[in-house]
């Protein structure tokens, strides 16, 4: 076996080992990690919700920090919803 074949074999082996270790946990839809073996909900780590600051566009699924969102003109003169 020459050097190139040995390097390729080591890369394949490292990839296989990495895939086997990566099977133990998978990222859930909010960025936390969930175990394959059915851990309880309190053991799943999730990111904390974040509110949108003043003068930022109002997103569809998040609340503004101030609690209100109104139509305002942007730099192009168009009306857009922004957090108060």
UniProtKB/Swiss-Prot annotation:
Gene Ontology MF term list: calcium channel inhibitor activity; toxin activity
Propeptide residues, chain positions: 23-45
Secreted listed as a keyword: yes
Principal subcellular localisation of the protein: secreted
Keyword annotations from UniProtKB, A to Z: Calcium channel impairing toxin, Cleavage on pair of basic residues, Disulfide bond, Ion channel impairing toxin, Knottin, Secreted, Signal, Toxin, Voltage-gated calcium channel impairing toxin
GO cellular component: extracellular region
Tissue specificity remark: Expressed by the venom gland.
Domain of life: Eukaryota
Annotated disulfide bonds: 51-65, 58-69, 64-83
Signal sequence, renumbered to the chain: 1-22
InterPro entries: Omega-atracotox (IPR009415)
Pfam families: Omega-toxin
Site (Critical for insecticidal activity): 57, 74, 82
Compartments it resides in: Secreted
One of the GO biological process terms: defense response
Domain notes: The presence of a 'disulfide through disulfide knot' structurally defines this protein as a knottin.
Similarity annotation: Belongs to the neurotoxin 08 (Shiva) family. 01 (omega toxin) subfamily.
UniProt function note: Inhibits insect, but not mammalian, voltage-gated calcium channels (Cav).
Protein name: Omega-hexatoxin-Hmo1b
Annotated organism of origin: Hadronyche modesta
Taxonomic classification: Eukaryota, Metazoa, Ecdysozoa, Arthropoda, Chelicerata
